[in-house]
Structure formats: structure tokens, C-alpha cells
């Protein structure tokens, strides 16, 4: 009998890739979205899923209609554009807690959570995410929890408001200059397919995991933001043609409290049999080639 996965954030970047991968693996998919959600990433998959609009339907309806075996929670609010703290907390903490309550009430087997490797007090987003993890740990005697802490993922179909797609969009427009920070920050850039594989790997090994498991999801190899952006520009010049855009590193200050190095320890994920398939160069080639054909 097919296992059923309830997926939140299915219309988003990560969620859309997870949705397609889980369907290919033969899982039954239930998704939570809003009536106003933009479904362009998953339009071709909508006929294969059961969908609930949580802004007009009770959240628990998905659980009373379906036997939910697993929840994969990718919905989040990044807190860009000067959003109110209450809006960020509503999505990242309160909405998440309502899903967790339903999981416990209806005996869902496992809650897969999407966390961040950012430090708790860096910003409102990271604080709200870490507060929810504390509740997950508190409730792990009632439901099995798998917490996946993601580093800087990238890939086709991400929002242009995010750093990597924004840089590519500026290069594609051949703007005169791009103002950046020093670029000395070290980050572990991981391609979206490798992130999805991490979720699938933990799902396939779920019986061997304890009541609360955490995994750092990164390649284990850090490079500077400056080096990464230069690689983006080099690949863009090959794909889009000669580019005269000047990269102005140091033109804007780093964010207050920003970590200069994010430590990724993916040992436990490697022990499950996971390993990244894409180098930075391979991932960027796929991403920028996609941007060439995108309208």
C-alpha cells in the first residue's frame, strides 16, 4: 500500500522539487497551499496530488480525509521586504505548530522539518525557525522528528529575490555593475537535486532513526561568496555572451552579526548513504543553462 506524504510549501522552490521526486518514488501526495498560491512550478503535477487550501479549508481536513504517514514541512517565511515580525512568526512558528498538533492528534508517523544552519539570533527568520525546532524536540516523544538543516541551496526555478538568481538576472541584463559585500563569507553552496536526495535518503532510512534526528545538509566543502559569484559570471559569459558587468565587492557592508563561516558537518548524512552528486561548477552549469532557455 502506498505511503502518504503531506507536503507543505509544495508551490515553492524546494517543495516543488520534492513533490516531483516523491511522486516518482510512488508516494501518494497531499499538499497544503493557499487559494492564491502561484502553482506555475507544479502545474503539470496538480492532477496527481490531493490539494487543500488552508486559507479557506480547515487544516485538519487533510488529516481526517487522508491517512497521513509522513509530513514534509518546507513552507516558510523568509522575512524579506520589511515584513512584520508577527507575519514571520505566524508562518514559521504558529502555522508550523498547528501542523505539528494535527500530526500528533492523528498519529502521523514522522515529521520532516526544514531548518537552517544560520545561527538562532542572526535575524527574525532564523530565530523563528530555531524556536520551532525546540518545540519539535519537546514533542519528539509523541512523533518521530527528522530535522534537516540546510545550507545555501540553489538551482533552476528559484525566486529571483534570492541571492543567486538575482545575481544571474543582473548578469543576464548586462547591468553596468553589481554592488556586493566583501564576498569573504564562506558558504557551502549545494545544488537543489542534492538537497532533495537528502530528504529521500532520510525517508528511506526512517526505521533506523531515533525519535529526534538532525542532519546538516551541505556538500562539506565551503567556498567564498566572491569565488562563487565569479564562477557565476564566468559561466554566464559563456552562456549569455560577453558580459561587461563589473562586480563591486565591498561596495555594501556585511549584515550585522553575519557569520563569516558556516560549519557543515554532514557525517551523519553520509553514513546513511547520501553523498552530493553535483560540484559547484556542475550545478552552476545546469542553473545558468536553464536561465538561457527561460523566457
Model-derived regions, located:
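Conserved beta-loop-beta element that borders a ligand/cofactor-binding pocket
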Residues: 115, 134-156
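C-terminal substrate-binding subdomain of Rossmann-fold SDR/epimerase-dehydratase oxidoreductases
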Residues: 172-295
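Active-site beta-alpha turn of Rossmann-fold NAD(P)-dependent dehydrogenases/reductases
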Residues: 75, 112-116, 149-151, 184, ...
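N-terminal Rossmann-fold cofactor-binding loop
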Residues: 32-36
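Short-chain dehydrogenase/reductase
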Residues: 89-93, 122-133, 158-165, 188-189
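NAD(P)H-binding glycine-rich loop region in Rossmannoid oxidoreductase-like domains
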Residues: 52-91
